[in-house]
């Protein structure tokens, strides 16, 4: 028997709570936890890809260098810097007199 059939039953053409101890702090806490769980589940289904991408990659930017030897990291930095330096040649310096 599900919880909904026990708690929410039609009473005199209205929906009401059949349990008498609804003011019990344990029942209130369980209700709050249930509502929060439902909200989090809905958000998880809506934003599943964003959430998993965040936990997989975190806040890191750029390619991961984990497990890459330092010599390869330095070589990569030099390649990136040389690419930036090569692009500087495209700019024309204009001096106004």
Swiss-Prot record:
Site (Seems to be involved in pH gating): 41
Family named by the database record: Belongs to the influenza viruses matrix protein M2 family.
Function according to Swiss-Prot or TrEMBL: Forms a proton-selective ion channel that is necessary for the efficient release of the viral genome during virus entry. After attaching to the cell surface, the virion enters the cell by endocytosis. Acidification of the endosome triggers M2 ion channel activity.
Topological domains, Intravirion: 44-97
Membrane topology qualifier: Single-pass type III membrane protein
Virion surface-side positions: 1-22
Lipid tethering residues (S-palmitoyl cysteine): 50
Residues carrying a glycan: 20
Protein name per the record: Matrix protein 2
Compositionally biased tracts (Basic and acidic residues): 71-80
Keywords for the protein's UniProt record, in alphabetical order: Disulfide bond, Glycoprotein, Host cell membrane, Host membrane, Host-virus interaction, Hydrogen ion transport, Inhibition of host autophagy by virus, Ion channel, Ion transport, Lipoprotein, Membrane, Palmitate, Phosphoprotein, Signal-anchor, Transmembrane, Transmembrane helix, Transport, Viral ion channel, Virion
Annotated GO MF terms: monoatomic ion channel activity; proton transmembrane transporter activity
InterPro entries from the UniProt entry: Flu_M2
Gene3D superfamilies: 6.10.250.1640
